[in-house]
């Protein structure tokens, strides 16, 4: 097994802003999103020395027996609340760019920067699920699928101009600024995340973003995402910018490999077929963006019970060793984790998995147990 002795890994948590987290299963924990739950999760992440938390935005769910993602909080207001009760951990909100003008998002980000004393960053999404926006009369038509990164490029230019200079006069196809002002500006450099996996998404990330988020792939195959990172490296070569990749994984751990595998099989056995079918229909709606989009992977029937993110299943020692392999892929800066049970999962991660990870020695500062 590859050992990550010389690689340091940053770790974040994809907090459950929507009901039931990331498992479309009747056999998984069923819960509603709340500020209190996400506060507990974020404080645990901070306590265990994790680096950041990110919340998504979801404006309409998938239905089914579990009402998957039918119940969601709003990302910016949630992160503003979390900014006020944390002291060290970095916080990222997600901007639904079809709903919010860039000048408003720039000001909201600057406000949370003030609340957090410089610990805030922004995830930009173009919008891929038509019903989220059509319900509000904001869907621009299906031709948008083919032009969404042109739209997002102008959006990001407005953000950068306002944050860096306090003023934008951008005259584009989608946005026309006229002496648009922002003050106060953020006290810290505002980092941008993008999770686009299409060729256009990669080109956008290499030009405007600081981090690229991509899906891990498979079960206990921690480096199978490497071709995705290689595509970003090719895009970066054209822009010369420093952009690192962060990889999304679900952790399902227990005291033994067998116990963890039993949980995973139980979740799969309770898969919410109706919600999964809805996800597939939404993925098929985009005929413009090519085969490499996130939604294509999410809707793949192979492991749709957790939207086909990379899954690490095993004992705490097994998961630690698998995570150490992730960061050996060149261009990888860290991981974004979700858990089947967030509160217990985070405590187990902090006390039983992280201390075994060579890639987290800079956090634990402990002599690590030998991982077979």
UniProtKB/Swiss-Prot annotation:
Its EC number is 1.14.99.46. InterPro entries: Luciferase-like_dom, Luciferase-like_sf, Pyrimidine_monooxygenase_RutA, SsuD_RutA_monooxygenase. One of its GO terms (biological process) is uracil catabolic process. The keyword Flavoprotein applies. One of its GO terms (molecular function) is alkanesulfonate monooxygenase activity. FMN binds at residues 57-58, 123, 132, 148-149, 198. Keywords: Flavoprotein, FMN, Monooxygenase, NADP, Oxidoreductase. It catalyses: uracil + FMNH2 + NADH + O2 = (Z)-3-ureidoacrylate + FMN + NAD(+) + H2O + H(+); thymine + FMNH2 + NADH + O2 = (Z)-2-methylureidoacrylate + FMN + NAD(+) + H2O + H(+). NCBIfam families: RutA. The FMN-N(5)-oxide reacts spontaneously with NADH to produce FMN. Requires the flavin reductase RutF to regenerate FMN in vivo. Belongs to the NtaA/SnaA/DszA monooxygenase family. RutA subfamily. This is Pyrimidine monooxygenase RutA.
